[in-house]
Amino acid sequence: MSSDLPGFFEGTEMPTAGWWEALWPDPAGVLATVGVKPGMDVTDLCSGDGWFTLQIAKIARRVVAIDIDRNLLEVARHRLAESGVTNCDFVAGDAYELAKLAPRPGDFVFLANAFHGVPDRLRLAQAVRETLKPKGHFGVVNWHQRPREETSIFGEPRGPATELRLSPEETIKSIEAGGLKLTQLVEVPPYHYGVVFERSPS
């Protein structure tokens, strides 16, 4: 299981495809909401089975999908290959080592449904900053800080444990401490919010 891997972030196990795809019927819309644009060089951090990676690759110049779970990366690789997408590299590794794993500098780092499980958020934010171009962006999609019982799909509670969830304010504080500046806070219905940060030009 992914959760048994050294360095795996708590509460970020890849869910079954059925409810995950029901939760995210329009991944391209989510990406547009947080500012992923055509022609960018994008890193999909903690990419899982590639549900968002595929949509990123359809518009990006180049994508690097990074996950600690090699099995999930193979699922993602197969997903993109079936769609005829060839502009993605798949890299197994620890998210904290992002600066060593992703080509630099990049336009955008995308992280969905994983930041709540990161033990050292400052360290991760600093690693992201190192990989971005000046004025590059870091987009985080997080579960709202609501009781798990209130975030149901197909009639069952979904998502991380209630105690792991972060408010937008907590997320913003953690990432700004790593040297990135908030540029956008958006709703990502039905149960998420998105926060976007920029690396300063200097």
Residue ranges and their predicted role:
Residues D4-G7, G11-P15, W19-W20, H137-V195:
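C-terminal alpha-helical "lid/dimerization" subdomain adjacent to the S-adenosyl-L-methionine
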Residues T43, D49-E97:
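Class I SAM-dependent methyltransferase SAM/SAH-binding core
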Residues E21-M40:
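Conserved alpha-helix/loop element of class I SAM-dependent methyltransferases that forms part
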Residues K100-F108:
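A short acidic, Gly/Pro-enriched loop at the edge of an enzyme's catalytic core
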Residues L122-H137:
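A short glycine-rich, Lys/Arg-flanked "PGG" loop and its adjoining helix->strand segment in the class I
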Residues V195-S202:
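C-terminal lobe and adjacent flexible extensions of AdoMet/dcAdoMet transferase-like proteins
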Residues D107-R121:
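A short SAM/SAH-binding and catalytic strip from SAM-dependent methyltransferases
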